[in-house]
Amino acid sequence: MSRQSETKKRTAKSDPIYRNRSVSMFINHILKDGEKSLAHKILYRAMKQIKRKTKKNPLSVLRQAVYRVTPNVAVKSRRVGGSNYQVPVEVKPARGKALAIRWIVGASRNRSGRSMASKSSYELIDAARNTGSAIRKKEETHKMAEANKAFAHLR
């Protein structure tokens, strides 16, 4: 067993324009091959498109989207007696937020369209309206947890 002390939880630094940690987390999830300036451009263009399309504050749309996609429960594989069970577990707020952002970015990438900025803007707007692939992913996860409720005692 390690003798070192437990590592502290690191929080994302807020981004320079919106001064928001969620935006910073989004940028870090969009990031590919270390091109952070490109990730910044993509998200800020998406935010401008959201403002133009919805006539609302893009930060509130992003917050609403993340809130709507955040799962309450998830399933975790647990091996008991030679067989694997999908055990439903509650999701902590920080993990839920990270999952929501990951699902939104993944759904944006899988969406058909030209630029990542437009795909991201459409996915964020859809998630804020409670539709879209990311919402479907959350509902799938909840259904899976509901179906495996019988194994909740295996935690």
From Swiss-Prot:
Keywords of this entry: Chloroplast, Plastid, Ribonucleoprotein, Ribosomal protein, RNA-binding, rRNA-binding
GO biological process, one term: translation
Entry annotated with the keyword S-adenosyl-L-methionine: no
Pfam families listed in its UniProt record: Ribosomal_S7
Molecular-function GO terms, alphabetical: rRNA binding; structural constituent of ribosome
GO CC terms of this entry: chloroplast; small ribosomal subunit
Keyword RNA-binding: yes
Localisation: Plastid, Chloroplast
InterPro entries, alphabetized: Ribosomal_uS7, Ribosomal_uS7_bac/org-type, Ribosomal_uS7_dom, Ribosomal_uS7_dom_sf
Record text on subunit structure and interactions: Part of the 30S ribosomal subunit.
Function: One of the primary rRNA binding proteins, it binds directly to 16S rRNA where it nucleates assembly of the head domain of the 30S subunit.
Family: Belongs to the universal ribosomal protein uS7 family.
HAMAP family on file: Ribosomal_uS7_B (MF_00480_B)
Name of this chain's protein: Small ribosomal subunit protein uS7cz/uS7cy
Organism listed in the record: Psilotum nudum (Whisk fern)
Gene: rps7-A
